[in-house]
């Protein structure tokens, strides 16, 4: 049976050898081919008839082998025998599909052939399903569209049909407001068009871009670019969504994800807004999804498509390929017998509030019944104490007073996991132990990046490495649980145990507590949380009891716990208010002192509770029917997971109100701010290598310990990349995460902008007053002597006066200046690091290498230094680069500059643009003027050029800027530092340094 119509394609300019084919391409389809497209893939009959035809005999050769390259044809134009033999299978027939060339608007010669009896791949012997013309550039499938489908697409996207006889794809190009879906293959493109979407098909997942090669045949990835057809479409902020197959093979998933990331990045660079469509149904391709579940399923998934950056984050945290057991339980209640006896590493991913810790408690009890000791490692002292209580073991601080003395096990913070800590930890004492890493993502992230671990990080990582190996080799087990468990922690543990026969077992609990009862989410936009503050105050005035989470505690931040407390105490004197932050929980006499252990007993006593990230993780607030709402204000300091963790501390199902900035400030980004682990690792290695060269060869020596601990550096880079991606699309990422956890976004009622501004201004006035009072108090308090100062630094519990004393002592010793309110503010703004750069660039240059060597020696353990730590602390690479950029020219008062006089400076900076980015954290582009570049770099030293005016002849007037000497007492600071460094280095036998000291 033949299905045909009277359509005949128009003539098409192209290769002469294919012209006759182009003129005679009538559309006729065999019944089997028609059913494959229409019934099997859900393509409209009209689209199938316009784009597909059945071929057999010699005709397919003319469609496929039209290239005029000598490799294909002899001098007389005839196809070479090798090609005829290779493609002999086409004579058995098949279907051909081709559409429109959007570059010309005419029919495309290029297309795809699917043989009824396909040839096999010479390597893997699998049938090659789809054939594309060889020795010609690949294109995309932009299928011809009938008027009915066109009308359907126009209606869906609310774009008017053209009155003139304009082609469909010309219409699409002319309307960038029309979104486009990219899929793989012609049939899927046809199915999407039929469903009412502008869709194009790639012949393969990697065919959206091209990678040039150098003379040696090596790919030049930095020169990758979109194919011309995609470049045409990716303009003017057009929305483009990927809709590739949802495969289950790990290797294929990795390939598809890589293709989306690369193509998506190029599309965004070209001006498109990129997203990704995913689904959980068994349907592999989008045509399967439509045929099996209907177009509504596609509409639903399109509605819930994820921005590229958010999808990349989800992709980095997806563990589905590692899962051994999937359950759907409100509270984890897995029979221990369901876990294989030989499984020594158990990973658990289960949502917040699903009883992970309670289930671990049962496991711990079974281990103790078998006479195995249990070691619980956490990232926070309070959490360690809480877990010790819940798991019925000792906290490390209780060993001396406990009747069991740690015989059953203990809980401790990972900061103490090394022999030189107060715990004097010895991994050899944990023979056959069961180790629990509750909230493993937080624990490992803390071990790898927390400033509290910096001094001993090399020892901590070595001990952790040895502990895991020793415990498991002696029959122990490792339990790793987290609501946000990612492949990063999973693979780090695997790397530690590389070469060992330890079997992992991964449990995934798919239950989402927010779905049990609908949890409402009110999500606020805007550049600041004034609208949220307005509704919060309204809720308080209406009698609601509110739990408020904010990212800051200090008075220097407008929306901090301290400033909100002051405002609310003034406005609502009848309300019972509790502030919980790092200072209040450690301040004797404060109502929040030591409250973390008993929140469920304390919080019901209050109407308004204000929390900082001190209550971000490790706390479960289980009280019911007390709080009416939860309010969250982020500033971009917390990670995406960290912010969402805070919102979930209260288990009760009450509405959540959330405001966060669109993007996190660049100052919060980790390492070089990169979005890929490879980029971060590359720059970490470069920085460390440069430091080694600049401070002396002895620092480059390392033991075999570095090889053993390489997996930790790679994990650090992966965690950093994940966090940076979240920071780069902060608002989108947090909203997506909350919605994926089951929250339901609700519409906000209209807010009076004038009232919101008044409320914001009131809080800002409170902040200005509080911040000034605090700075004055710090400046007026007595400067502690050295003994008192050291005691204050070690002291955990401190009164407000003691905190001010410690800060005063630090400022006095750091700057050598009289402590004033102005100095406190400058220090808060990062003045110390700015002056430090200028000091070692100028008068202190002779001491820079010695300083960095001392830092290296402090951090090293058996010749090993964790590179991110030494990179954060070493200044030599920064100083070296600033010298290469000739920054000294701007430090001479009275010297003037114009854009023209700094052209050479700009060229030099552009030459070093990449090192400027990963060493100084500044982005330099060709679009910046020379003076803009100079000001950006001088900002690193808290300096700037002063504008003097426009001078010169009428035809050549130029803006003139002058270098000025800052009037901020920095010379006194430098003199203080010079005296300090001379005293430290006076006894060092180094001719260069000794000569400098004598000259100084």
From Swiss-Prot:
<dbReference type="InterPro" id="IPR049996">
    <property type="entry name" value="Slr7037-like"/>
</dbReference>
<feature type="region of interest" description="Disordered">
    <location>
        <begin position="787"/>
        <end position="812"/>
    </location>
</feature>
<dbReference type="InterPro" id="IPR034154">
    <property type="entry name" value="TOPRIM_DnaG/twinkle"/>
</dbReference>
<dbReference type="InterPro" id="IPR027417">
    <property type="entry name" value="P-loop_NTPase"/>
</dbReference>
<dbReference type="Pfam" id="PF12965">
    <property type="entry name" value="DUF3854"/>
</dbReference>
<keyword id="KW-0614">Plasmid</keyword>
<feature type="compositionally biased region" description="Basic and acidic residues">
    <location>
        <begin position="787"/>
        <end position="809"/>
    </location>
</feature>
<dbReference type="InterPro" id="IPR024385">
    <property type="entry name" value="DUF3854"/>
</dbReference>
<protein>
    <recommendedName>
        <fullName>Uncharacterized protein SYNPCC7002_B0001</fullName>
    </recommendedName>
</protein>
């Amino acid at each position: 049976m033949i299905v045909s119509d009277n359509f005949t394609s128009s003539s098409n300019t192209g290769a002469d050898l294919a012209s006759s084919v182009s003129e005679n391409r009538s559309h006729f389809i065999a019944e089997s081919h028609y059913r494959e497209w229409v019934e099997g893939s859900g393509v409209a009959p009209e689209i199938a008839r316009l784009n597909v035809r059945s071929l057999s005999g010699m005709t397919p050769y003319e469609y496929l082998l039209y290239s005029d390259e000598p490799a294909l044809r002899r001098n007389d134009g005839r196809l070479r025998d090798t090609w005829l033999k290779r493609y002999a299978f086409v004579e058995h027939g098949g279907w051909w599909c081709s559409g429109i060339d959007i570059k010309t608007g005419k029919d495309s010669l290029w297309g795809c052939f699917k043989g009824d009896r396909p040839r096999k791949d010479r390597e893997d012997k699998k049938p090659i399903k789809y054939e594309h013309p060889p020795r010609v550039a690949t294109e995309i499938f932009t299928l011809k569209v009938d008027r009915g489908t066109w009308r359907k697409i126009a209606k869906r996207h609310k774009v008017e049909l053209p009155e003139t006889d304009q082609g469909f794809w010309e219409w699409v190009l002319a309307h960038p407001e029309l979104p486009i879906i990219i899929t793989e293959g012609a049939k899927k493109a046809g199915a999407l068009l039929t469903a009412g979407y502008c869709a194009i098909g790639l012949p393969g997942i990697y065919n959206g871009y091209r990678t040039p090669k150098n003379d040696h045949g090596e790919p030049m990835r930095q020169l990758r670019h979109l194919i011309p057809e995609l470049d045409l479409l990716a303009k003017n902020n057009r929305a483009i969504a990927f809709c590739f197959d949802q495969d289950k093979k790990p290797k294929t998933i990795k390939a598809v994800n890589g293709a989306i990331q690369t193509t998506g990045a190029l599309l965004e660079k070209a001006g498109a807004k990129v997203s990704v469509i995913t689904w959980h149904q068994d349907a592999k391709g989008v045509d399967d999804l439509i045929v099996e579940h209907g177009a509504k399923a596609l509409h639903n998934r399109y509605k819930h498509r994820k921005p590229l950056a958010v999808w990349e984050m989800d992709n980095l945290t997806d563990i589905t390929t590692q899962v051994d057991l999937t359950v759907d339980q409100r509270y984890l209640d897995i029979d221990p017998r369901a876990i294989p006896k030989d499984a020594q590493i158990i990973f658990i991913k289960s949502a917040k509030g699903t009883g992970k810790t309670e289930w671990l408690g049962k496991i711990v009890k079974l281990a103790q019944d078998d006479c195995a000791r249990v070691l619980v490692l956490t990232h926070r002292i309070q959490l360690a104490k809480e877990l010790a209580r819940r798991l019925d073991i000792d906290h490390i601080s209780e060993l001396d007073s406990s009747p069991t003395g740690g015989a059953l096990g203990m809980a401790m913070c990972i900061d103490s996991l090394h022999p030189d800590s107060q715990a004097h930890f010895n991994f050899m004492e944990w023979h056959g132990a069961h180790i629990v890493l509750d909230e493993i993502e937080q624990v490992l992230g803390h071990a790898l990046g927390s400033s509290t671990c910096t001094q001993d990080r090399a020892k901590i990582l070595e001990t952790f490495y040895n502990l895991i190996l020793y415990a498991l080799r002696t029959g122990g087990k490792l339990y790793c649980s987290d609501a946000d468990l990612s492949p990063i922690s999973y693979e780090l543990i695997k790397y530690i145990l590389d070469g060992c026969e330890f079997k992992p077992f991964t449990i995934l609990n798919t239950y989402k507590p927010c779905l049990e009862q609908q949890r409402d989410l009110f999500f606020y936009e805007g550049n600041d949380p004034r609208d949220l503050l307005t509704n919060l105050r309204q809720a308080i005035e209406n009698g609601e009891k509110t739990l408020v989470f904010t990212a800051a505690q200090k008075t220097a931040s407008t929306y901090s716990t301290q400033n909100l407390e002051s405002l609310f105490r003034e406005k609502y004197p009848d309300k019972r208010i509790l502030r919980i932050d790092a200072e209040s929980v450690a301040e004797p006499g404060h109502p929040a002192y030591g409250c973390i252990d008993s929140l469920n007993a304390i919080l019901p006593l209050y109407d308004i509770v204000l929390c900082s990230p001190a209550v971000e993780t490790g706390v479960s607030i289980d009280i019911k029917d007390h709080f009416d709402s939860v309010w969250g204000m982020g500033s971009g300091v917390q990670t995406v997971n960290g912010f969402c963790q805070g919102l979930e501390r209260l288990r009760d199902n009450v509405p959540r109100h959330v405001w966060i900035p669109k993007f996190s400030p660049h100052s919060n980004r980790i390492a070089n701010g990169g979005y890929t682990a490879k980029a971060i690792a590359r720059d970490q290695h470069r920085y460390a290598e440069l430091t080694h060269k600049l401070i002396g060869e002895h620092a480059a020596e390392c033991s075999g310990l570095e090889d053993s601990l390489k997996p930790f550096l790679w994990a650090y880079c992966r965690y950093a990349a994940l966090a940076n991606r979240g920071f780069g699309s902060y608002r989108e990422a947090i909203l997506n995460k909350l919605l994926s956890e089951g929250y339901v976004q609700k519409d906000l009622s209209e807010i009076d902008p004038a009232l919101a501004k008044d409320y914001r201004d009131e809080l800002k006035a409170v902040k200005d007053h509080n911040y000034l009072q605090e700075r004055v108090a710090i400046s007026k308090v007595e400067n502690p002597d050295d003994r008192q100062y050291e005691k204050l630094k070690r002291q955990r519990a401190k009164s407000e006066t003691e905190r001010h004393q410690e800060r005063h002592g630090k400022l006095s010793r750091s700057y050598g200046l009289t402590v004033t309110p102005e100095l406190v503010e400058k220090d808060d703004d990062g003045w110390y690091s700015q002056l430090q750069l200028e000091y070692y660039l100028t008068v202190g240059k002779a001491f820079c290498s010695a300083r960095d060597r001392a830092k290296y020696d402090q951090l090293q353990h058996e010749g090993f230094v964790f590179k991110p730590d030494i990179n954060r602390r070493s200044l030599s690479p920064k100083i070296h680069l600033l010298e290469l950029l000739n920054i000294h020219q701007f430090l001479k008062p009275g010297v003037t500059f114009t854009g023209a006089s700094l052209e050479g400076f700009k060229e030099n900076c552009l030459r070093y643009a990449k090192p400027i980015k990963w060493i100084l954290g500044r982005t330099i582009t060709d679009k910046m003027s020379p003076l803009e570049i100079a000001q950006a770099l001088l900002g690193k030293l808290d300096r700037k050029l002063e504008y003097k005016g426009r001078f010169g002849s009428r035809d050549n007037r130029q803006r003139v800027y002058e270098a000025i000497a800052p009037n901020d007492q920095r010379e006194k600071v430098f003199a203080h530092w010079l005296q300090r460094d001379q005293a430290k280095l006076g006894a060092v036998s180094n001719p260069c340094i000794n000569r400098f000291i004598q000259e100084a």
